[in-house]
């Protein structure tokens, strides 16, 4: 499912909301999650999961084409840990 399909699904299930309102809500939710992660905050959606930022150390990698050693700088990456309810639904418990 892509963002536009999510917006359409929510709009279809909530006829009192226009598609433009739903789009604004979905975009705001995503933007707030992104801003919180950029500040280094953790975002927890109970039952669904938690978004956080993890630090990756610098390392020596390899260029797959040439096999040459390449320095990979340290960086921050987004991380998602699933919640128990989501795991249980995926595993049909």
UniProtKB/Swiss-Prot annotation:
An individual GO BP term: DNA recombination
Swiss-Prot/TrEMBL keywords: DNA recombination, DNA-binding, Transcription, Transcription regulation, Translation regulation
Keyword Nucleotide-binding annotated: no
SMART domains the record matches: BHL (SM00411)
Family according to the record: Belongs to the bacterial histone-like protein family.
Biological role stated in the UniProt entry: This protein is one of the two subunits of integration host factor, a specific DNA-binding protein that functions in genetic recombination as well as in transcriptional and translational control.
Identification of the protein by name: Integration host factor subunit beta
Gene this chain is encoded by: ihfB
